[in-house]
Amino acid sequence: MTARLYGKGREGFLGGDIDWDADIIKVVAIDTANYSVSIDADEFLADIPAAARVSISDALTSKTKALGVAGAANVVFQEVTGADIEAIALYQDTGNEATSRLIAYNDESADLPILPNGGDINLNWDAGVNKIFKL
């Protein structure tokens, strides 16, 4: 499950505004019926309409960055209800959706779409060489 990087996310890494190790990084589960990605224009979580946000994870743990490849422990979305999940996006959580920078987007995982049923949803990152994403 290799993700595409948002242009502004890439800019954030290069400008030193995103610190993979120190920053709070979360994952938003997305209903694409309410969001059309603009990989180079979308910048902040606020660019993903609230109606498209099916669930948000806790902060990523056990983050790694060897050789420019981002990795982390698998994610659990808890007690998810609502629309089908057709995509996910990683973002730097500042506590304010207007400044929480989007990092990566994935709508091509073999695990998608997911139909929530009120239970937990496990998101397992790719164990291969590209893990979550590669800079």
Located regions from the model:
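Small cysteine-rich, disulfide-bonded extracellular modules of the LU/uPAR three-finger superfamily
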Residues: 1-86, 93-135
